[in-house]
Amino acid sequence: MKVLITGFDPFGGESINPALEAVKKLPNTISNAEIIKLEIPTVFKKSLEKIEANILAHKPDIVISIGQAGGRFGITPERVAINIDDARIEDNEKNQPIDLKVFEDGENAYFTTLPIKAMVKEMQESGIPSSVSNSAGTFVCNHVMYGVLYMINKKYPNIKGGFIHVPYIPSQVVSKPNMPSMSIEDISKGLELSVKAAVENNTDIKTAQGEIC
């Protein structure tokens, strides 16, 4: 089995992206699955082009993309991606799409095909804060999650795919009072446990991970 796991380069004025740094720290094998690590640009369209090129090159069974969500307290596997690009800031090539569809012929939304509740359980049982997220935003993270699931739906039905958001690391919040953070070691361990759950669970578990509002 092969798992393609991607991490974004730094964006939004940050000098580091914990998503990419945590991906780099992952072992090359998890639960007997080969781990293929890929840096992708925080750029609309180009990020998806790079992922698809690596899908074609490596033929992975699972694709997991990792992104930074500053302000979140834990590691949050995403439940759903929506067909909208609505960028509050420019990407790394100064693109700023507003109210545009990711793909004109795509569904309004695609749900993850990863066992996200099993992932959360693995992390929580190891003492790593984690919960299911019901919004991947409308920036490049959602763009990538939606785009990968669109490709899976249209071209690669045997691949499982989804997205995980991670918090800031401590060095990023020195000048951001009261902003939560997590060590890069805990983030990487959480991702390793998430990959383990994805490899070992063909279907998700039934646990309450919903939100009131």
From Swiss-Prot:
Recorded E.C. number(s)?
A: 3.4.19.3
Iron as UniProt keyword: no
**Per UniProt, which keywords does this protein have?**
Cytoplasm, Hydrolase, Protease, Thiol protease
Query: A biological process (GO) annotation for this entry?
Result: proteolysis
Enzyme kind, highest EC tier: hydrolase
Query: What GO molecular function annotations does the UniProt record carry, in alphabetical order?
Result: pyroglutamyl-peptidase activity
- Matching SUPFAM superfamilies, A to Z? Pyrrolidone carboxyl peptidase (pyroglutamate aminopeptidase) (SSF53182)
Among the Pfam families in the record, one is: Peptidase_C15
Q: NCBIfam families in the record, alphabetically?
A: PRK13197.1 (NF009676), pyro_pdase (TIGR00504)
In its UniProt entry, what is this protein called? Pyrrolidone-carboxylate peptidase
Tell me which species this is from: Clostridium botulinum (strain Alaska E43 / Type E3)
